[in-house]
C-alpha cells in the first residue's frame, strides 16, 4: 500500500502509514465500467475487505483473518478479537511499538462461527467488539464457548468502536496541544 490518497484516508481514521503499509494492500477494481482503488485487508481464504472514503465492501470469499504472532502454546496465551480491520489497525496504532498477542479479525460478526475453533484453542479471549447489540451478542456467544473471556468494549465507551475512540483521542490531543501553544495573556 503506497497510494498517498489511501494512506491519507487511513490517516484521517488515525492509522499511521507504516502500520497501513505493513497490514494492508492496495486494491484496484472495476465497478459498472469505472476503475476505483481502495485499501484491502486479506482474510485467510484469499478474499479481501475493501475500504475507501466512499465505499465499504468485500471481495469473495468472506472469511476471518487470523494474525498469529505467538509461537508458543495457545492454551497459555491470549487472543484479541476485533469486528473489523479498522479496529484491528486502531489497536496497533494505540499499542505502537509494543508486542501484540495473536488477533482474530471477524470482518463481520456474522463470521463469528468461522472463528470459534480458533478462539477455543486459546486460554483467554479479549474482545474488542462494537458497543452495540450485535457486539454484545457476539461477546455472549464467545463466553458460552470459551473458557476465559474479557469484554474490553467498556474501555472505549461512549464510542461505538475502537476506531472512533482512537479518532477522538487524536482530536483531543491536538486540541490540548493547541491550547498549550497559545500565548499567555
Model-derived segments and spans:
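TOPRIM metal-binding catalytic domain and adjacent DNA-binding surface shared by DnaG-type primases
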Residues: 1-39, 179-185
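Surface-exposed charge patches
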Residues: 8, 89, 144
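Generic structural signal for bulky hydrophobic/aromatic residues embedded
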Residues: 9, 13-18, 44, 94, ...
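Short secondary-structure transition/capping segments
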Residues: 10, 66-72, 150-158
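Phosphate-handling DNA/RNA-contact segment within nucleic-acid enzymes
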Residues: 29-121
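TOPRIM fold recognition
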Residues: 76-77, 93-185
Amino acid at each position: 500500500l503506497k497510494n498517498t490518497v489511501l494512506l491519507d484516508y487511513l490517516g484521517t481514521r488515525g492509522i499511521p502509514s507504516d502500520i497501513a503499509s505493513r497490514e494492508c494492500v492496495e486494491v484496484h477494481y472495476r465497478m459498472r465500467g469505472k476503475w476505483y482503488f481502495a485499501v484491502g485487508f486479506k482474510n485467510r481464504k484469499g478474499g479481501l475487505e475493501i475500504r475507501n472514503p466512499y465505499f465499504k465492501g468485500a471481495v469473495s470469499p468472506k472469511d476471518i483473518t487470523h494474525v498469529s504472532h505467538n509461537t508458543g502454546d495457545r492454551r497459555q496465551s491470549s487472543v484479541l478479537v476485533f469486528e473489523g480491520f479498522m479496529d484491528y489497525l486502531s489497536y496497533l496504532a494505540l499499542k505502537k511499538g509494543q508486542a501484540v498477542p495473536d488477533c482474530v479479525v471477524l470482518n463481520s460478526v456474522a463470521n463469528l462461527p468461522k472463528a470459534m475453533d480458533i478462539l477455543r484453542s486459546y486460554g483467554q479471549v479479549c474482545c474488542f467488539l462494537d458497543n452495540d447489540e450485535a457486539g454484545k451478542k457476539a461477546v455472549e456467544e464467545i463466553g458460552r464457548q470459551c473458557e476465559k473471556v474479557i469484554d474490553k468494549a467498556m474501555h472505549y465507551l461512549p464510542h461505538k468502536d475502537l476506531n472512533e475512540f482512537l479518532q477522538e483521542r487524536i482530536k483531543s490531543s491536538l486540541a490540548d496541544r493547541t491550547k498549550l501553544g497559545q500565548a499567555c495573556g
